[in-house]
Amino acid sequence: MLIETEATPNPLTRKYLPGRTVMATGSRDFPTASAAEASPLAHALFATGDVDGVFFGRDFISVSAKPAAAWEELEPDVLSILLDHFVTDAPLFAPGTAAGIAIDPNDDGAAMAVEEDPADADIVDQIKELIETRVRPAVAQDGGDIVYRGYAHGTLYLAMQGACSGCPSSAVTLKRGIEGLIKHYVPEVQNVEAV
């Protein structure tokens, strides 16, 4: 089995493509080791001691290293863990864990950043459609994801996950790329903020 490795714009994160589906629907972000307890794979990656975050996308896994870690030393361990997981067809999540349920990117259970005005429902629908069809596929190419967190008074709130979380260029991506696209198609949006 061959697992492709890709660099991401975030120098601390690598994207791994196993050549098969990782998450059939939604995505999963494990920003801490304690969040990874429901996934034997994510738990094993954190157990290396040098992993700072794990993200499961549709057909990829992003692994973020701690700032002091050296990828030259960490990558063989990561590849070994990933190969072992996929060669043995191990489950992605521990049996019986509710955390194994895939997360709908528009409803992952996290709190909204603001209370939305029901009068903005059409605007919110337009925003969510753009995020789903234009933004998320582009961000996934870099090993990350964007999650809607609310819209109020002209400001759109988004959470960045995977390789996008903590990436030095994420502010530029958010402001120049995502904000520009959303404002072009939904002129009611005046500002985009990360939460």
Feature names for model-found ranges:
Residues M1-V195:
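Domain-level signature for proteins that mediate thiol-based redox and metal-cofactor handling
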